[in-house]
């Protein structure tokens, strides 16, 4: 009698139990044609059904400055680092935000702050 209720609860909370992508390290370096942003992510990729699928660079006001798509799972490469070059960061900003996502859970709720050295 209680088994259907328990099964329904487990199914309803399954995605909430999944681990979100975590920014392990990040830096932004100025260059001749914009900034290069390097982000190291950790995520328990399981394969094509659940993997870290990208990250975005945001201004403090939430405006998107860049997006790095991750096109395949990194099951055996954790954590892993990817770069995005040519990011135009407006003068006057002292930091940007990095927000990763995964194919199952979407965007993480709290982005990671990266201070800029100009």
Report each predicted region and the residues it spans:
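Intrinsic-disorder/low-complexity, polar/charged segments enriched in Ser/Thr/Lys/Arg/Asp/Glu/Gln
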Residues: 23, 34-36, 79-83, 111
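Short, solvent-exposed, Trp/other aromatic-anchored flexible loops in extracytoplasmic proteins
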Residues: 66-106
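Edge beta-strands of extracellular beta-sandwich domains
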Residues: 106-116
